[in-house]
Amino acid sequence: MSPIIDIYCHIYPDRYFQEMIRIAPNLENIGKRLRSVTKLFDLDARFKEMDEFGDYRQIISLPNPAIEDIARPDVGLNLARIANDAMAELCRKYPERFPAFAAALCMTDVDGSVAEARRAVNDLGARGVLLYTNVAGRPLDDPEFEPIFAALAELDLPIWLHPVGTAAMPDYPAEKKSRFEMWWCFHWP
């Protein structure tokens, strides 16, 4: 029987999560909430659940928040490198669990993102790139991002699109903010 390969599975590598909280301490509250989603962090719990599905594998990527939403471009680029190094390490350590990952970028550092996409794919083995549906409030088709998309086209790998929103973004016109927190799972852009 062929393996089940889930291509949209989020994970917080510990090194990345610790650095994210360090550079964005205002995320401490959401960090506590995210920690309650055990399988984002706890590999034993994740593997136990994966085993319930037989030969089940995950292509891993980062969850919200987008790097560019929490860090200046120079700091964000380093955070993307930490994430990509950590996800590549997980894939090397557990190839039967995590055969591949989608690389993280900091889209507000265009030149850095081009270089990081190439490094993640060519040196670390990323099989694509995860992008959020807006970049710090700007659409993905903003001309500033064209060099990133040109590099991604050259790499000829898939782009994962992650919906993004915040509690401050209303789900309906009559709301002042998201009443039911649908932004956790739906938000285009």
Where are these regions (language model features)?
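Helix-coil boundary/capping segments in enzymes
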Residues: 1-189
